[in-house]
Regions:
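Low-complexity, glycine/serine/proline-rich disordered segments
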Residues: 1-68, 76, 111-129
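Functional cores of ribonucleases/endoribonucleases
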Residues: 71-122
């Protein structure tokens, strides 16, 4: 689990799409803010890559992560529990404010060219240690 040291700004990313582009163009900003993907402790489970991020405000952190990951999205489908955004390269970014597994917020990344969906859960303190 990686700890997010500062409290992120809360926001759902850009309200309207910025110039469209693929997910790869957002990885540098995700690395700066969250250490993605190298600093996260990835575990393989049921065909998915799972990681956890510790944050002072897990919902704000998940929202920030999803906003950065989906910057430049080409379409969005709102959900009761977040949103699904599609990138120009076909990558899908899903924000779930509350998951059915344990109630934590999570971001799912279905990255074009990868064989596993990446799921990042966000926790407060040592709740998942």
């Amino acid at each position: 689990m990686i700890a997010l040291s500062s409290k992120p700004e809360c926001g759902l990313g850009s309200p309207t799409p910025s110039p469209s582009h693929g997910f790869a163009e957002n990885v540098g900003n995700l690395k700066d803010a969250f250490g993605y993907p190298d600093d996260l402790d990835w575990k393989l489970k049921k065909g998915k890559k799972l990681a956890s991020v510790e944050a002072e405000d897990p919902i704000a952190a998940a929202t920030m992560f999803a906003g950065i990951a989906s910057e430049g999205f080409v379409s969005e489908m709102p959900r009761d529990n977040g949103y699904i955004r599609k990138m120009d390269d076909g990558t899908i970014v899903v924000l779930r404010v509350t998951t059915s597994s344990d109630g934590s917020p999570a971001v799912d990344l279905n990255i074009v060219g990868e064989s596993h969906i990446r799921k990042i859960h966000f926790y407060k303190g040592d709740n998942n240690a």
